[in-house]
């Protein structure tokens, strides 16, 4: 497995702006680490990874992930006092923007006269809260946003973040809500230019993406609290696969969610038993992530306490 992981990174295209990303990351961690600012730090991954089919990518394989869970969870982590490294897919849902329309620039604003625009009265409160909450989180140094698109970018940045958080130890957490591709086209076997469509049917052989969770737990950030996710469309196999992932990767909990009910309830699978977490149906503005993050924060507190004993 380690050979496969090494081979994946060695053959991946280099991450753009790596030095700038690392500088921002280290500055953020220094500001918020327990020896400096006293905050716990969580890396929330969000959205889905793309699989390019050409090196100069025109076509790619994608998944449906909108990033809603990662965005909602980030808001709750900030509210709970965490500093959040938000590793997100470009173009997916952002923290504090979930109450805005799909096209906020065009739907939230109107002309006040021929030259000036203003927020439409029907969206005024939502825009005000979104801007205020976002700016407060950034100004207080509790939110760092890092974008990705491809499977290559995501895994290179996840490794970078994990290694940077290694010294933070138990006060760091990984909340891995991103939908990571299981299969990909190795970079060296890709055509450079756009695949021609006039040559008939297209046959593509996909390789399996090496499972990085095990090396994150064992090498990159072994003392960090780690939460992974398992999504299935078949509820009959969901719990079995979540339990298997818990044992195989030695994470602290697996959040099991079934596609059709994922916005209403999830099951947190851990060595101490399974806990069903539901959205509070009597509160229209509530989300399942509200209760989920409360539970995860409590579990993290216990983990930190036990680590210091």
From Swiss-Prot:
One of its GO terms (biological process) is coenzyme A biosynthetic process. Its EC number is 6.3.2.5. One of its GO terms (molecular function) is phosphopantothenate--cysteine ligase activity. It comes from the Eukaryota. Pathway: Cofactor biosynthesis; coenzyme A biosynthesis; CoA from (R)-pantothenate: step 2/5. Keywords: Coenzyme A biosynthesis, Ligase. One of its GO terms (cellular component) is nucleus. Homodimer. Catalyzes the first step in the biosynthesis of coenzyme A from vitamin B5, where cysteine is conjugated to 4'-phosphopantothenate to form 4-phosphopantothenoylcysteine. This is Phosphopantothenate--cysteine ligase 2. The gene is PPCS2.
